[in-house]
């Protein structure tokens, strides 16, 4: 079971930013929001999954902390106590120690937010277990660092979609406002493969929500196996998804794709994903390799 959340948080306000409006090939898409219920079994499974990635969590925490440290160094370069105040009149008024001021210490807070977007289509059936571990790894890492984030899963209802309307379902797995609380994590275990995937729509929705956040850096990480597939979408889906990614980047959102699998990844799939995401596409065979693959994206 799940509860409909059209008015939950910003769930009901999609399409206010014209840059991300659903039009053209997506003009007849309807959006339904859900919050999946957490079962006792989800809670048990979550503990197992968390234990599976405990070492990777430590690695990813270190990588993000390095990113924070580098920002510190850039900001404090050549200054003994912090950034030089613009108003040099203070030199004459106060003693010289007050000439410098420190920006708020960011060692425990990182002025960034993340949205994880998970393709919950049928083609993910053999990749979902590994993807869930990757999402748990991210959630636990960001929670440890006190970084607010949102996790959404998306699919299109293949049985209800027709010329008139294409219902797309967004599952709110982790709510931004509650993302650093303990009790939310087990909802990640509700992720399961459903029907089709209209990636361009999901990316526009996630981007619009990200732009409502006041953080300096915004990351959108799409966990997907590549090719979009939905009603009347197959031919133009790749182009539509590419356009959604490019639009998000124009607004300063850092977008990249993560393909997590235990199986070798074919060249055809790699090429499709590169066509959409450019160089910011990660192909990872096994969640244990995810931190090392992410490092260049976060530290570039």
List the model feature ranges, each with a label.
Residues 106-217, 219-222, 257-264:
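Von Willebrand factor
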Residues 274-300:
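C-terminal helix of von Willebrand factor
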Residues 1-112:
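Acidic/polar low-complexity segments with low predicted structural confidence
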Residues 116, 122, 133-140, 149, ...:
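Feature representing long, continuous alpha-helical segments
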Residues 140-148, 211-216, 247-251:
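Secondary-structure transition/capping motifs at alpha-helix termini
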């Amino acid at each position: 079971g799940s509860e409909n959340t059209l008015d939950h948080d910003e769930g009901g306000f999609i399409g206010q930013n014209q840059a991300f409006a659903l039009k053209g090939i997506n003009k007849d898409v309807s959006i339904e929001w859900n919050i999946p219920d957490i079962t006792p079994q989800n809670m048990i499974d979550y503990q197992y999954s968390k234990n599976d990635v405990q070492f990777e969590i430590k690695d990813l925490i270190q990588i993000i902390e390095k990113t924070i440290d580098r920002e510190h160094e850039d900001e404090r370069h050549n200054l003994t106590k912090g950034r030089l105040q613009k108003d040099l009149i203070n030199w004459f008024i106060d003693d010289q120690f007050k000439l410098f001021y420190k920006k708020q210490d960011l060692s425990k807070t990182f002025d960034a937010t993340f949205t994880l977007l998970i393709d919950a289509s049928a083609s993910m059936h053999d990749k979902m277990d590994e993807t869930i571990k990757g999402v748990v790894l991210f959630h636990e890492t960001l929670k440890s660092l006190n970084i607010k984030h949102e996790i959404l899963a998306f699919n299109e209802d293949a049985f209800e979609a027709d010329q008139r309307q294409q219902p797309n379902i967004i599952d709110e797995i982790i709510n931004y406002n509650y993302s650093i609380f303990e009790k939310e994590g087990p909802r990640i275990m509700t992720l399961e493969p459903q029907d089709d995937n209209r990636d361009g729509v999901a990316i526009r929705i996630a981007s619009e929500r990200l732009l409502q956040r006041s953080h300096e850096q915004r990351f959108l990480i799409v966990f997907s196996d590549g090719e979009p597939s939905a009603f009347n979408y197959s031919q133009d889906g790749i182009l539509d998804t590419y356009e959604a990614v490019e639009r998000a980047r124009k607004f300063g959102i850092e977008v990249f794709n993560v393909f997590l699998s235990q199986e070798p990844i074919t060249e055809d799939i790699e090429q499709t994903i590169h066509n959409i995401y450019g160089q910011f596409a990660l192909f990872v065979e096994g969640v244990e390799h995810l931190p090392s693959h992410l490092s260049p994206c976060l530290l570039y």
